[in-house]
Every structure is written in C-alpha cells, then in structure tokens.
C-alpha cells in the first residue's frame, strides 16, 4: 500500500508536467531489490528502472558520475552506452539479469496432465522447453509462458512478473482436488542471469561441468548444472 500511495501521489502531482519517453520516476523507490542489486548499482554503475516495484537494470554507465538518465524527446544520454551494450552482445557476449520474470515449479504425478489441460500447447519431453499461451474459460489470452520439463512430475515455468499474482491465483483455482499437483511460486529466492551472444556457449562451458556443446545442448534444451 505504501508503494501504491506514493505512486498515486507522484502521478497526481505531475498531472500538468511534461512526461518524457522512458522517464523513470523516483517515488517509493527502491521498493524491492534483487540479490544482485548492490553489485550492479555500486560496483557496475547501473542505472535502474522500476518494474512493478522491482528495481531492474536499464543500462550501465562507464563511471558513477554518468549513471543517471537525462530525459529528452531526442536521443538521451544513454544512447551511446546502450548502443555499446547491444554491439557487445551481438558481436561477443553479454549478461542480462532476468529477475523480472516470474518463476514457478509444478510438481506431482498429475502435473503433466494438468498443464496439458491448462495450456494450449503440449508439454515437452524431459530436458526440453516449450512456449505456450494460457487461455481463460472464454478462450481469451491471459498468459504466455516458457515451460521446461525438468523430470517426471516436475516442470519449471517462466512468465510475466506483472501478472504473477493473477497467474498464481488462476493456477490455485484450477488445481485438482486430489492433491496430485502442487504449484510453488518463486520470488527473490530464485533469480537468474541470461548469457547471450555468439560467445555465450564458451562462457557457459567455462562455468559448468556438463557438456554444453552444440550437439549436446541444442536450442530449446533444458539442463540443470552447478556453477
């Protein structure tokens, strides 16, 4: 409620102010942070944004003195730095924090049949991923998920953070009465990093002991490994 009140007051106080593209406003921040917050903000000059109350990195400045947005209707001060980040990922490798994805674990002997009923797509084989929408009783889209089959009776799901409370409520309302399915929603107890770019596989290979070569770790494959 503190966050909502502060944001409502901030919005009302600026009702006649000019709002710039991509402008981030300060009220009630930081409301929630990830375990990587201090590392990104203080050690890597991150400029943070507000994603449904969660502090997430927008871009990284070369020095602490430059780590702030200057809102503009033209190219702002982040243009050069964001461009360098994009080129780095396109040409070499980069890391993106993905804490702003909702994460769930569905377990139990009835998990696969339940997900097949709840989602529009068929569940994948063990060690594979699938992308699938979720519809309500009227056939309207209410969610879009990435689902991995981690093992028999165990699925890991990624979805929208902003809709996570609604989605969890929908899951709970449609659980079978026999207790054959359990759903757990992770929050800041499980965050993630995405390694991306042409050299992503090289970086991952140096961090884990499993074989992540192209022949053994294909597109849409799912593996669990210790780092």
Walk through the language-model features, giving the residues of each.
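Glycine/proline-enriched, intrinsically flexible loops and inter-domain linkers
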Residues: 2-227
């Amino acid at each position: 409620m503190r966050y909502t009140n502060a944001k409502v007051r901030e919005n009302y106080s600026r009702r006649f102010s000019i709002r710039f593209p991509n402008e981030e406003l300060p009220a009630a921040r930081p409301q929630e942070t990830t375990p990587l917050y201090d590392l990104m903000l203080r050690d890597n000059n991150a400029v943070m944004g507000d994603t449904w109350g969660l502090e997430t990195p927008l871009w990284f400045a070369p020095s602490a003195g430059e780590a702030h947005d200057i809102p503009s209707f033209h190219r702002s001060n982040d243009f050069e730095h964001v461009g360098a980040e994009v080129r780095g990922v396109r040409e070499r490798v980069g890391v993106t924090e993905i804490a702003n994805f909702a994460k769930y674990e569905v377990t139990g002997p009835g998990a696969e049949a339940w997900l097949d009923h709840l989602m529009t797509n068929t569940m994948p084989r063990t060690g594979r991923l699938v992308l699938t929408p979720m519809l309500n009783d009227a056939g309207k889209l209410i969610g879009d998920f990435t689902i991995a089959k981690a093992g028999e009776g165990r699925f890991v799901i990624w979805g929208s953070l902003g809709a996570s409370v609604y989605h969890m409520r929908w899951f709970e309302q449609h659980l079978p009465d026999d207790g054959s399915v359990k759903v757990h929603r992770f929050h800041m107890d499980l965050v993630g990093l995405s390694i991306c770019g042409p050299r992503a596989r090289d970086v991952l290979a140096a961090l884990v002991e499993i074989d992540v070569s192209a022949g053994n770790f294909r597109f849409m494959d799912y593996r669990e490994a210790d780092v």
